[in-house]
Amino acid sequence: MLKVKNYEFWFITGSQHLYGPEVIEQVSDNSKIIVDELNKKDLPYKIVFKTVATDSPSIRKVCNDANNDENCAGIITWMHTFSPAKMWIHGLTELRKPLLHLHTQFNKEIPWGTIDMDFMNLNQAAHGDREFGYIGARLDIARKIVVGHWTDASVSADIAKWMAPAVAFTEGHSIKVARFGDNMRNVAVTDGDRIEAQIKFGWIVDYYGVGDLVKSMDAVTEDQIDELMAEYSKLYDIDPKASIDSIREQAKIEIGLRTFLDARGYTAFTTNFEALHGMKQLPGLAVQHLMAEGYGFGAEGDWKTAALLRAMKIMASGKGTGLMEDYTYNMDSENGLILGAHMLEICPTLAATKPVIEVHPLGIGGKEDPARLVFKGASGPAVAASLIDMGNRFRLIVNSVDCVEVTEDMPNLPVASVLWKPQPSLKEGAKAWIMAGGAHHTSFSFYVDEEQLLDWADMVGVECVVINNDTKLSTFKNELKFSSTAWKF
């Protein structure tokens, strides 16, 4: 399993010297209490109280310390007292880590019988956070705003949700995609500007000939294949009719891929059925098992989906997230559904049933029958996300969907599949998706939601459009027009 660093988030409390050392000390003590309490909640990463920031030099220093600390994935700010926002300008303009503004206060209720000016000098978040909010808006800084008392479960839940895209953003500069072969010939949507992707997301996308992969596969030993076959037998059922030699070939491909990727620091990759010279099979089971271990993947050279999938794997902690393709429709006007699948490469973390390794012919690629995992997908709320290149910008398109149980069998189509109703409906959802230019490949997840993808898009600075139950096509069409105009500037 690919590991993600054990990141931390820095808590920085705003104040000023005006109130004197006793108030500053109390601000510090209260901040530590809040941080300790938040860390008792179910947060995926630890919060560390760093400082009470009281002047421009100290704010600038702590922001740059956060930039330079490899373990810091973002900062959380709160204005306990009033903190004049001009002091924050230098620090915030230089901050390169995600920012969450926690709008809370130490006391939960107004102490009607005892409230006095001493209390008000200490507890000024109601207007102190508004001052901080103004400078955030004036500087046009990407920031998440969470409102509520720090003891409320909803507050810690909102912070926890935001941490996932923040870590994915920070890890973005570690995402490297290896392309084995080029994009599928003449396909438009899987192409794109790899230089701009590195500038915008930090993703490094490199090309390798299939011969480089074949060379890595040739170095695989029978003992290594035996070991991986034993792992397959623990994780998956094996169709008794399946050719063991075909399964062993996929194990060889997987080991060759993993060795190649790990030796060079790649966490995502693509293949293309048009570029298989020297290989006996199109990678199927090999790709599925690697995705289950956290690697991003894109079919037919789709490097944008591969990198996005790796980012969403980070957000989801590896759970319930994988490559998807809109395969075919159930166009019943009363029950419009999308069957999602691919030739071979659907991640088993999306499965509702224990996957089965099967071997069947594949009428594409011109190679031997490949082994693949076959299963029916889980049910429940999910998202399908597509990243496309619009020429002058990237656009992230997110569709919230409702997955349903796959009750029918497909004896003549041995693929892994997921079945869902796109929001607001198949008719309206497909119209909106096509209107926005959404791809046929998506990164699909049960453990990432539209809010987290909106947060991530805000962090990286790309356009994001959402299709859900609130979508009205006339409004959505205008949103796309306005967005296209705005992003030209």
Swiss-Prot record:
Domain of life: Bacteria
Cofactor requirements of the protein: Mn(2+)
Catalyzed reaction equations: beta-L-arabinopyranose = L-ribulose
Residues where Mn(2+) binds: 300, 325, 342, 441
The protein's annotated pathway: Carbohydrate degradation; L-arabinose degradation via L-ribulose; D-xylulose 5-phosphate from L-arabinose (bacterial route): step 1/3
CDD domains: L-arabinose_isomerase
Signal peptide: none
EC number(s) on file: 5.3.1.4
GO biological process, one term: L-arabinose catabolic process to xylulose 5-phosphate
GO molecular function: L-arabinose isomerase activity; manganese ion binding
Uppermost EC category: isomerase
Note describing how the cofactor binds: Binds 1 Mn(2+) ion per subunit.
GO CC term, one of those recorded: cytosol
InterPro entries: Ara_Isoase_C, AraA_central, AraA_N, AraA_N_sf, Fuc/Ara_isomerase_C, Fucose_isomerase_N/cen_sf, Lara_isomerase
Kinase among keywords: no
PANTHER family: L-ARABINOSE ISOMERASE
UniProt similarity note: Belongs to the arabinose isomerase family.
HAMAP family documented for this protein: Arabinose_Isome (MF_00519)
Role this protein plays: Catalyzes the conversion of L-arabinose to L-ribulose.
Name by which UniProt lists this protein: L-arabinose isomerase
The gene coding this protein: araA
